[in-house]
Structure formats: structure tokens, C-alpha cells
Amino acid sequence: RQLARYDLSICVVEAANDIALGASKANGGLVHAGYDPAPGTVKAQVNARGCELYGTWAEELGFLFTRTGSMVLGFNDEDRAHLEKLRCNGLANGVPELSIIGPERIHELEPRASADATCALWCPSTGFVDPFEVAIAALENAVANGVTFMRSAPVEAIEVADTGATGADDSPRFTLVTPAGNVCCRYLINAAGNGAA
């Protein structure tokens, strides 16, 4: 979707007969805020930034996004130390408003939480989406902006041109071999989920 904003020829090659039938169909829809990844990693950077952008994407594309917030419960001092580590990770990663809360606030936010919980990491920026709705909205927007969608086209092979993957001219560097036809391209983004290897 983002690349469709530029003067490029783009093709989304999908193995299945429609979008979101791979790893996306098993996604629970929780938009993680970014307190889990180790600070400084690419995952930390894209996780926190992605969570931040979901509100904008929802407005632009018309899918439902709700900032539900999340709690990670702790039941003893060891858990509290782990929650503090997650809080520090999150703050380093740019996650806003993380805090450690006590039993009273836990039950104010979630009355059915375990009565044994002594503390929790509260993260108000965590959100929830329907992963199918997001994938469909993003692809529809991309197609409306000139992206080609090739379905039922599992990639059987990727051939690299003699110039190699770093060829200097404008000729295609890669050929994706699929039963639906071959796709020649200069750049290849592998977003195949579990089939990406």
C-alpha cells in the first residue's frame, strides 16, 4: 500500500486464491505495543511505530481499530521484577504511558482479573483489529492505486539474473516462477509469512 504512492509497477503475488489465508487467518488481532522486543532491535523499532500508526491506517482505510489496552499480570516479587524489565524495554522502545499498577487499579480496569494478582504492567496503547479486515482494506487501497494482485500463484522458484541481485542497470534482476505466470522484477519483498523461507 505504501509503495503504491510512488510511480512504480508493483505486483502482489499471492499463493492462495485470496488474501489473508496464510498466517493472517490464525492471527488473534492483538496489536502489540512494543514492550517485549529488546531495545535497539529492528523488531522493537517497527513494533512500537506500527502500533502508533494503526490509528491513522484505520482512519485512512476504514477498518475498525480499538485501543483496548492490555495488562500482564504478576503474582509475586519475581513477576514484578519481570514486569519492570518489560516496562523499561517499552519505554526505551518509545511505548507511551506504561506503568506498573497494583491490585485496586487492576480490578478497576478488569473486574474479572485474578484476585491473586499483586501487580500488572498496564499498557493503554495496545489495540485490537480484525486481521482479515486490515489485509483486505490495505490490498483494496493498493489495487485502487495501481497495484496488480496475482492470486493462486505460489512461487515455485526465484531465478536471479546473470547480473546478480545487485545489477546496476534497469533490467529485471529476479524472475518469480509461478503456475499463474512468471513475474520479472528489479526488487523483491518477501512477505510470505510462514512460507517465506
Descriptions of predicted regions:
Residues R1-R5, V31, T56, L61-T66, ...:
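Active-site substrate-recognition segment that forms the wall
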Residues A4-A26:
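Glycine-rich FAD pyrophosphate-binding loop
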Residues L8-I10, E97-L98, L188:
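Hydrophobic anchor at the start of a short beta-strand
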Residues E14, R67, I101-P103, R151-A153, ...:
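Short loop/edge segments at beta-strand edges and connector loops
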Residues A16-D18, I106, A138:
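Short beta-to-alpha linker loops that shape the active-site pocket of alpha/beta-hydrolase fold enzymes
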Residues G29-L109, T118:
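Dinucleotide-binding Rossmann-like beta1-alpha1 core, especially the glycine-rich loop
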Residues L121-Y187, A191-G195:
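Helical element adjacent to the flavin cofactor pocket in flavoenzyme catalytic cores
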